[in-house]
């Protein structure tokens, strides 16, 4: 609005589901706005901008501009578009898989931006055998740490730095912020778990959490952890730090299959006008702002809306598996074949299930369960992330076959996803 008042032409790009009222811009570029026939609806924000650049280049080509100046090679940006696609956890439809695959190809050829190269170095990762999983868990959190605790500028400056030394300086600053983020996240997660222990109804259809000491940039991570632990849609709130927004709290939510979080917030907004000051998001993740004094009303409305729209069996976590494997399948060739494919939302990595003998188990960093398993005389290493409770001597486990890279070595490792017991079923 300010730019329009100053006489500037304003172009807004977005990829979220649009609100009823669009921004006051000259052009709104969003494949998800009503009436837009662009076929790729699952693009992340960087993906939308990439296609806008492609369209702009095409228009300039038709105008004859490139008869006078060199045509830019936009493929040099595909590593950043791939990183953004992975980091934003958008559905990996056919087009997004192509983007990520091409981006990883260039990274493995060492044809990547200086900023991404610097981030891989501080993360201790090698560009020549990088995977989508490593970009998701090693690079993306370091970029996001800036926006969570400081300002997004640091991440942007790192990624657009043209020279390696400058990019590495920014990457090191992001590394320090990420370490700080981990500490704060652990503290907030412990607070959240303690709060849930005092809730009136631990079996409620949804969870709302708020602490005046929490950081608004980290509540989404807390909501994600609690959602995973309790398998309930979860929204975590923290005080707004924006000037002039005193008395408001910002929430970040994560949902489960069967509960569309943004549509749930939209229903609450229609039934309780003015309760939600602003909101937006997707089916599994959303953000919102409300007044602190309205939290009890919102919590009641949220649980009611979730329960109303929950299909039968929504709150029972079932792990779908692709079948059992033979001990002879536990090889690096199988692991490498699976690792070579780009997996993600809407294109999930295969999960297998077998009965194992648990030979040894120990906690790593008091957080992850490291396992030595055996099946029909074949030994295999495994890990269960964020699992502290020990396993029985024999267990029927759901798992992914992964390549573990550590100290320059690549080894096969099972990543445990679930265990069959009386409460959870493997289908």
Label the model's feature ranges.
Residues 1-23, 28-31, 187-195, 227, ...:
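N-terminal small/polar loop signature for handling phosphorylated ligands or for N-terminal nucleophile
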Residues 6-7, 58-294, 300, 320, ...:
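Hydrophobic helix-and-loop "lid/oligomerization" segment in the mid-to-C-terminal part
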Residues 15-18, 27, 32-34, 212-213, ...:
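Short, ordered loop/turn segments at secondary-structure junctions
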Residues 24-65, 74-83, 281:
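Short alpha-helices
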Residues 265, 376-390:
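Beta-strand/loop nucleic-acid-binding surfaces
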Residues 294-300, 394-427:
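OB-fold single-stranded nucleic acid-binding module
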Residues 316-380:
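Accessory interdomain/linker segments of ATP-dependent helicases and helicase-like nucleic-acid enzymes
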Residues 360-365, 384-389, 402-413:
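Single-stranded nucleic-acid-binding OB-fold domains
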